[in-house]
């Protein structure tokens, strides 16, 4: 993990290394404990940032992963659905079309580039935990993605 970001980002291991799963389970447990204790986390619920599949096409987001539902179901946290304005650089969009590893390696570049700069975002919906439907992890994640889509013009793959 990039030392500059260590205080602000919980690490996710994308490689196939032997201990990758163990590290990701630890990160998930850490996130759940943060949420149970009133902490706040921001995640990319699709497991990645949105990106443009072809030149000239708008940025699209993948379906949200069950991890979001798991974090909510296991921590009983409230949820604030937020949409950040803008997108990553053209270089990121072009490189993303060629190789997933290149795209992942450019995340740090994009994050570091935006540190200590104002970011525009919209809070679209705040959900108290008692108002969140009781669903399995995957169904809950997709339900929340549909809630976001109702409130903003966002393409979903």
Give the positions of each predicted feature.
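Non-catalytic C-terminal accessory region of glycerolipid acyltransferases
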Residues: 25-157
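Catalytic core of membrane glycerolipid acyltransferases/transacylases, capturing the structured
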Residues: 1-22
């Amino acid at each position: 993990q990039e030392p500059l970001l260590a205080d602000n980002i919980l690490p996710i291991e994308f490689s196939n290394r032997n201990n990758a799963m163990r590290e990701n389970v630890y990160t998930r447990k850490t996130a759940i404990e943060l949420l149970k204790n009133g902490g706040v986390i921001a995640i990319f619920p699709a497991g990645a940032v949105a990106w443009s599949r072809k030149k000239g096409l708008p940025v699209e987001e993948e379906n949200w992963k069950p991890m979001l539902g798991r974090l909510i179901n296991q921590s009983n946290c409230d949820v604030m659905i937020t949409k950040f304005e803008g997108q990553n650089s053209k270089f990121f969009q072009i490189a993303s079309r060629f190789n997933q590893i290149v795209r992942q390696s450019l995340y740090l570049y994009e994050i570091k580039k935006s540190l200590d700069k104002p970011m525009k975002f919209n809070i679209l919906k705040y959900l108290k935990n008692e108002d969140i439907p009781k669903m399995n992890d995957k169904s809950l994640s997709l339900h929340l993605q549909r809630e976001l889509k109702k409130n903003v013009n966002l393409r979903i793959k």
